[in-house]
A protein has these predicted regions:
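Short, flexible, surface-exposed loop segments at domain boundaries
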Residues: 1-50, 55-122, 127-167
């Protein structure tokens, strides 16, 4: 089918060991996962279903609900319906899910976490809820989930924001 061909073609064009695929959207109603290729800046959409295996970075089974925006995943294979066979959290990145002591130096494109400095690149994805935001929207009250490779930040997700109080 055309769907299968598209999925296999995408799988071949995306699947390089060096590629970093950042989850930009998960739609459980349509069973789709959109990923952003950090290396190329290109977005891809994959379908998943009952035959898709979801795994953590150690290879242990998990649920699709354990994958979130900002996670880095590896996607491989396509079944006869063109759905991904395996979606696994990447072991090529580090994750810190509870960052509260941070600051952003916009001039240097640096995120300071505690006493350590990390680079914010042009392709670093920053999420708040379902929105993609920029560093200007981060506040000291936010709690962040940060994903990186060495000293480079790949993605940031605001897990708890300062919010607003509506009276």
């Amino acid at each position: 089918s055309g769907l299968k061909a598209a999925a296999e073609e995408n799988g071949k064009s995306v699947k390089k060991s060096s590629d970093i695929l950042i989850v930009s959207d998960i739609n459980s109603a349509n069973e789709t996962i959109r990923v952003y290729n950090y290396s190329t800046g290109v977005q891809y959409q994959y379908y998943y279903g009952l035959t898709t295996g979801f795994f953590d970075k150690y290879g242990n089974h998990m649920s699709v609900s354990d994958i979130h925006q900002g996670d880095v995943v590896d996607i491989s294979g396509a079944d006869s319906d063109g759905k991904a066979k395996r979606i696994q959290k990447s072991d090529k990145v580090w994750t810190n899910d509870a960052v509260t002591n941070f600051s952003v130096d916009k001039n240097k494109s640096v995120l300071e976490i505690g006493n350590s400095s990390y680079r914010l690149g042009e392709r670093t994805m920053i999420f708040s809820g379902s929105d993609v935001i920029d560093t200007d929207s981060l506040t000291a009250q936010d709690k962040l989930a940060v994903v990186g490779i060495d000293k480079d930040i790949v993605s940031i997700s605001v897990t708890t924001g300062h919010g607003t109080l509506q009276l």
